Swiss-Prot record:
Catalytic activity: an acyl phosphate + H2O = a carboxylate + phosphate + H(+)
Family: Belongs to the acylphosphatase family.
Lineage: Bacteria, Pseudomonadati, Pseudomonadota, Gammaproteobacteria, Methylococcales
Protein name: Acylphosphatase
Record flagged with keyword Cytoplasm: no
Gene3D superfamilies: 3.30.70.100
Native species: Methylococcus capsulatus (strain ATCC 33009 / NCIMB 11132 / Bath)
Assigned EC number: 3.6.1.7
Pfam families in the record: Acylphosphatase
Active site residues per record: R18, N36
Length: 92
């Protein structure tokens, strides 16, 4: 199991990044959340098997078709098992 905290920079708001990330994470069987930040970045926490988390990170580097990802800050965290689904949260 693996858990990551990710900050995605670039043109990632207003391009369906959150919805697309949530869909991809759910397809991969991951739990966690994604939300927009006031500074224009997207923040997400994902938890699940390591291979699926790595697949989501690879997707995050590209994002949906209209996104232009310029940076990805990834930090591994302790697995907690606190989530039951992957959710899109309200903006901060």
């Amino acid at each position: 199991m693996k858990r990551v905290h990710v900050l995605v920079a670039g043109r990632v708001q207003g391009v369906w990044y959150r919805a697309s990330a949530a869909r991809k994470a759910s397809e991969l069987g991951l739990t966690g959340w994604v939300r927009n930040l006031p500074d224009g970045r997207v923040e997400l926490v994902a938890e699940g098997d390591a291979e699926s988390v790595d697949a989501l990170l690879a997707w995050c580097r590209r994002g949906p078709p209209l996104a232009r990802v310029t940076g990805l800050d990834v930090r591994e965290m302790a697995v907690t098992g606190e989530f039951t689904e992957f959710a899109v949260l309200r903006d901060v």
